[in-house]
Amino acid sequence: MAGAEVEEEAGIPKKIESTEEVLIKCQCWVRKDEEERLAEILSINARVSPSKFYVHYVNFNKRLDEWVTGDRINLDKEVIFPRPKRQLEEDTNKKQKKKKKFPQKAAVVESDAKSSEMGEGSDVMDLDNLNVRGLKDEEISREDEIKKLRTSGSMIQNPHEVAHVRNLSKIIMGKFEIEPWYFSPYPIELTDLDVVYIDDFTLQYFGSRKQYERYRKKCTLRHPPGNEIYRDDYVSFFEIDGRKQRTWCRNLCLLSKLFLDHKTLYYDVDPFLFYCMTRRDEMGHHFVGYFSKEKESADGYNVACILTLPQYQRMGYGRLLIEFSYELSKKEGKVGSPEKPLSDLGLLSYRAYWSDVLITLLVEHGKEVTIDEISSMTSMTTTDILHTLKTLNILRYYKGQHIIFLNDDILERYNQLKTKKRRHIDAEKLLWKPPVFTASQLRFAW
């Protein structure tokens, strides 16, 4: 098996007496939530007393990484130290020499196995290859995944930045205290502070409450600095041009990076439009979430980055953002898809949205419909539609063609959707025309 060949290099277990002996890349047992978890030391801050250690819990999401003090590290158990680089190279060379023995025999066995699999039921098309190249069920390392990221849009190839240690401990926005998930390139003077204050309306950042309150008294802005293109009794949407509102959009990118890992946001915001969702009260329009969109996307993406702030998550706002992005695509007369790769939370949200839209359309349409017709009605790409149908397990191969089969589970899910009181975007309240940019307006300075 190919997977058996990939082995993690074992470290050197060692008993230590003090946390002063702990080094970066060591693995040790750390107390968290009344249990001990194996964690890797990513950084050490010796400028404070007592020293703090930035840890990543092995096999857990990166957003759980945190700073811990030495008293949470269990020194009764052995600490695993990384092997010296020279020893690693010697071990790697030995393994490569072993792999060179009998390579042809292994290859023949593998090819025979593949040919026997293809021989049976070869008249059934493999749905994994239906216009969905690049989404195979394969395991790739984090480094390989970073190399595959796009270098246009909201992505850049910078593995060092992706691996940064989270640098802010806590932010306060309005009445909410929020713990950031990831690194964001805020000014270095803010990184040693216990709390950073971020204004609810301008997204400007401050190192002290006094600075923030003085600024708030003078600032009159009470909504995102753009055109309000949608309003209902629940939310509003504003369209902001990154070229016209650089400072506000850069502040938005800094805030977003605290909660987005895969996406590495450009500091140059000129190529993007930002669509910001707000909730209104007597104070003004409070920022809830947003998605950005390239003014001219060569890949046909209708979303570059999408985020609902943590204090508003699990309240249906993310779904409204997704729905709104497709309403814009319908107005443009185009199909669209979010920029890949999506974050884990983003992927779950999109899959749920695509599934619900397709189930509702297929049940209520009640007639034969092609994939292209579904695409034109929903503005979803055929790739996203086929993936979703495959995930729902309702795409069948029958008499030489693919058909969509609505089983009892799908009908039951449709009935459940109808009983849910979800909010939706009212297309009639969208006052917007697709912006048109000249060649000079799309010429961005670098």
UniProtKB/Swiss-Prot annotation:
- Domain (MYST-type HAT) spans 163-434
Q: Which GO terms describe its biological process?
A: DNA repair; DNA repair-dependent chromatin remodeling; positive regulation of heterochromatin formation; regulation of transcription by RNA polymerase II
Q: Kindly provide the PTM information from the record.
A: Autoacetylation at Lys-263 is required for proper function.
Q: EC class of this enzyme?
A: transferase
Q: Where does acetyl-CoA bind?
A: 304-308, 313-319, 343
Q: Which residues carry this modification: N6-acetyllysine?
A: 263
- Main site of residence? nucleus
For molecular function, the Gene Ontology terms on record are:
chromatin binding; histone H3K4 acetyltransferase activity; peptide 2-hydroxyisobutyryltransferase activity; peptide butyryltransferase activity; peptide crotonyltransferase activity; transcription coregulator activity
Q: Which residues form the active site?
A: 339 (proton donor/acceptor)
Q: Which GO terms describe its cellular component?
A: NuA4 histone acetyltransferase complex; pericentric heterochromatin; site of double-strand break; Swr1 complex
- Tell me what reaction this enzyme catalyses: L-lysyl-[histone] + acetyl-CoA = N(6)-acetyl-L-lysyl-[histone] + CoA + H(+); L-lysyl-[protein] + acetyl-CoA = N(6)-acetyl-L-lysyl-[protein] + CoA + H(+); 2-hydroxyisobutanoyl-CoA + L-lysyl-[protein] = N(6)-(2-hydroxyisobutanoyl)-L-lysyl-[protein] + CoA + H(+); (2E)-butenoyl-CoA + L-lysyl-[protein] = N(6)-(2E)-butenoyl-L-lysyl-[protein] + CoA + H(+)
Q: Where is the Tudor-knot domain?
A: 24-75
Query: Position of motif ESA1-RPD3 motif?
Result: 246-267
What is the annotated quaternary arrangement, including any partners?
Answer: Component of the NuA4 histone acetyltransferase complex.
User: What does UniProt say about this protein's domains?
Assistant: The ESA1-RPD3 motif is common to ESA1 and RPD3 and is required for ESA1 histone acetyl-transferase (HAT) activity and RPD3 histone deacetylase (HDAC) activity.
Name of the protein in its database record = Histone acetyltransferase ESA1
